[in-house]
Amino acid sequence: MALWRSSDNLVYLPPTPVSKVLSTDDYVTRTNIYYYAGTSRLLTVGHPYFPIPKSSTNKADVPKVSAFQYRVFRVRLPDPNKFGLPDARIYNPDAERLVWACTGVEVGRGQPLGVGLSGHPLYNKLDDTENSNIAHGDIGQDSRDNISLDNKQTQLCIVGCTPPMGEHWGKGTPCRQNTQQGDCPPLELITAPIQDGDMVDTGFGAMDFAVLQANKSDVPLDICQSTCKYPDYLGMAAEPYGDSMFFYLRKEQLFARHFFNRAGVAGDTIPETLYIKGQGNGRDVIGSAVYSPTPSGSMISSEAQLFNKPYWLRRAQGHNNGICWANQLFVTVVDTTRSTNMTLCVSTDSSATYDASKFKEYLRHGEEYDLQFIFQLCKVTLTPDIMAYLHTMNNSLLEDWNFGLTLPPSTSLEDTYRFISSSAITCQKDASPTTKEDPYAKLNFWEVDLKDRFSLDLSQFPLGRKFLMQLGVGARSSVSVRKRPASTTRGSSAAKRKRAKK
């Protein structure tokens, strides 16, 4: 006899609805007022491989300045709500607030194109595995050699209103406790903000070389004790509010120039099922199978330059369509096509004959930048829904606009100390801070202040003229070409000539 029974499957419940993230175009109203802002010539000079400390202190006397470093500019903008506007009727200060929208940017780069070499005087190179004539496993105590190379070629520009995020491989936490000295450490993908001076991926991977390479000779000098970061494009593209990356420009290229293997004891033994043992001629013990190429960025040409040209932001990749929250903008730049390292030579003696020991050689690298922007004045209508949304997105935004949460007065008697930082009283941990803290105070950026560099005269600046030409409102020529009117007597004169022939 057949009996009906209910299904054993679990009941499907719909997922919890996700709170909708609004685009800035939904609550930001754009005006027809545009401003130009630009920096002066920004210069930096230093040693391309390492900082040079002072003899008395650990403070760097000559900083490390390399073309393979990130340049992260933190651009400070004036508060538009305290700005001298051409028309005070643009917005209602009781119900609206003004913000800046970045609509155009141009990153200018000076200095000629050039290739700067990197390397290590004690590079971990065992054999040339591309043109090897013998396979052996005899490894001496020290087979390091002086090797130089041209790194991977990278051009990069990221624009956003929060610092860009980078990723790299670091040392993770092992699950088992009985680890021994010499065991391979676990790897962990670490995400952290990209700061000014961080090293880019030069072709050896994005990783913490100071922790993961103990011999200090597997990579060139400029990164052997540094962390190379790669922009976390996936994370920034998936960011809910789209603040860290409005848009980005990227060009990378490299190829493997030389092929080496590493000296050292193989931590991972090759399984015997993968080869047949040899006899004699050094093949009874196989050599190192830890192969490593030296990268090369190949040819540099002015035809493939991302810089010194304007870019117009019409639609950002995220929900933030170019609005500069907190009146700041972060511009991240990498340009390895101008990586020339200048060699300086100073003589220590006035000898008439050449003696190499009488000359000192120095290395320096210099960089030149110029930032230009077009900002559009926008306004936000402060309805209760929009204020609640902005508070959820950034709780300090309303405080900057002089909106605070007023608590109801307390009916109980509370204690208020006069000197809250005094050692004579109990620690006042719950006391509110006297001054607002910068959320990026512990991060290193190249500070650029544009509070005094805004101008409405767009036609007086290079990027402003390009922007006006894009809008079709550029200055037209005052010389007009007038066409000569057609003659009205041509037909009658022709008829007269015909009659005259008769």
UniProtKB/Swiss-Prot annotation:
Per the record, the GO terms for biological process are: endocytosis involved in viral entry into host cell; virion attachment to host cell
Q: Which domain of life is it from?
A: Viruses
Database matches in SUPFAM superfamilies: Group I dsDNA viruses
Keywords in alphabetical order:
Capsid protein, Disulfide bond, Host nucleus, Host-virus interaction, Late protein, T=7 icosahedral capsid protein, Viral attachment to host cell, Viral penetration into host cytoplasm, Virion, Virus endocytosis by host, Virus entry into host cell
- Using the UniProt record, give the first listed, main subcellular location: virion
Instruction: Note the Pfam families from the entry.
Output: Late_protein_L1 (PF00500)
InterPro entries from the UniProt entry: Capsid_L1_Papillomavir, Capsid_L1_sf_Papillomavir, dsDNA_vir_gr_I_capsid
What are the GO cellular component annotations? Answer: host cell nucleus; T=7 icosahedral viral capsid
Q: What parts of the sequence cross the membrane?
A: none
* Subcellular location, record wording: Virion; Host nucleus
Q: Where do the segments described as Disordered lie?
A: 480-502
Molecular function as annotated in GO: structural molecule activity
**HAMAP family found in the cross-reference section:** PPV_L1
Q: What does this protein do?
A: Forms an icosahedral capsid with a T=7 symmetry and a 50 nm diameter. The capsid is composed of 72 pentamers linked to each other by disulfide bonds and associated with L2 proteins. Binds to heparan sulfate proteoglycans on cell surface of basal layer keratinocytes to provide initial virion attachment. This binding mediates a conformational change in the virus capsid that facilitates efficient infection. The virion enters the host cell via endocytosis. During virus trafficking, L1 protein dissociates from the viral DNA and the genomic DNA is released to the host nucleus.
Q: How does it assemble?
A: Self-assembles into homopentamers. The capsid has an icosahedral symmetry and consists of 72 capsomers, with each capsomer being a pentamer of L1. Interacts with the minor capsid protein L2; this interaction is necessary for viral genome encapsidation. Interacts with protein E2; this interaction enhances E2-dependent replication and transcription activation.
Which family is it part of?
Belongs to the papillomaviridae L1 protein family.
Output this protein's name. Answer: Major capsid protein L1
